[in-house]
């Protein structure tokens, strides 16, 4: 009997996780299948307990369920997920325990390392102050980066930075509004966009243009649809190094795969599968 895995969210029909994980299971000869399940916040508790009762191998969670899942009494988050305040991966233990993890931060970290970014001491500008920004900023602060969180609503950026500072991590962090972005980027090593600006169908939107970027910068956009966002095009024009959101998607998925199975996933195949799905 096949072991079932899946992603819960609403909406969830657009998810590339089923294609990515099913390709990995097939390549490794594992008798497993991964589905997308539409689950609304009010049904989340029943859905998780139902999945555990039916013997699911594990679950991914996406918008709008990550924060709500952390608050469920029976979900036991690891320290990083607890700090971030959200879980995106659930692992069902043999004794009925349900462990919660957040693989978004590790996924972003691996994407940066793969591109040759030295995280410790790097001056990083993180655009956005939502759930993705929290996951990325907590991870990078834990790894010793010097971070400035920028957001249209300055209070949110300042609040997030204050919260991360209170965790007493090796990195430095501050928050600000958008007004000083040009000056910040002049001295920055990395710009990470964690907002939805530029995501399909609003593909002409961008947080900055080529004039505000420079060739010494690495620009990382976590948006992966379209494959090359306007921000990444602007970065390429300026001579900056670019990182596609596909890498973070694949690496966070690969980390979930390891947590569920204890098996090393076929990363190149997962990446190829996602790229083919986006180009279809």
From Swiss-Prot:
InterPro entries: Aminoacid_DH-like_N_sf, NAD(P)-bd_dom_sf, SDH_C, Shikimate_DH, Shikimate_DH-bd_N, Shikimate_DH_fam, Shikm_DH/Glu-tRNA_Rdtase. It catalyses: shikimate + NADP(+) = 3-dehydroshikimate + NADPH + H(+). NCBIfam families: aroE, PRK00258.3-3. NADP(+) binds at residues 128-132, 151-156, 222, 245. Shikimate binds at residues 15-17, 62, 88, 104, 224. Its EC number is 1.1.1.25. Homodimer. It comes from the Archaea. GO terms for biological process: amino acid biosynthetic process; aromatic amino acid family biosynthetic process; chorismate biosynthetic process; shikimate metabolic process. Gene3D superfamilies: Leucine Dehydrogenase, chain A, domain 1, NAD(P)-binding Rossmann-like Domain. Involved in the biosynthesis of the chorismate, which leads to the biosynthesis of aromatic amino acids. Catalyzes the reversible NADPH linked reduction of 3-dehydroshikimate (DHSA) to yield shikimate (SA). Belongs to the shikimate dehydrogenase family. This is Shikimate dehydrogenase (NADP(+)). Pathway: Metabolic intermediate biosynthesis; chorismate biosynthesis; chorismate from D-erythrose 4-phosphate and phosphoenolpyruvate: step 4/7. GO terms for molecular function: NADP binding; shikimate 3-dehydrogenase (NADP+) activity. It is an enzyme of class 1 (oxidoreductase). The active site is at 66 (proton acceptor). Keywords: Amino-acid biosynthesis, Aromatic amino acid biosynthesis, NADP, Oxidoreductase.
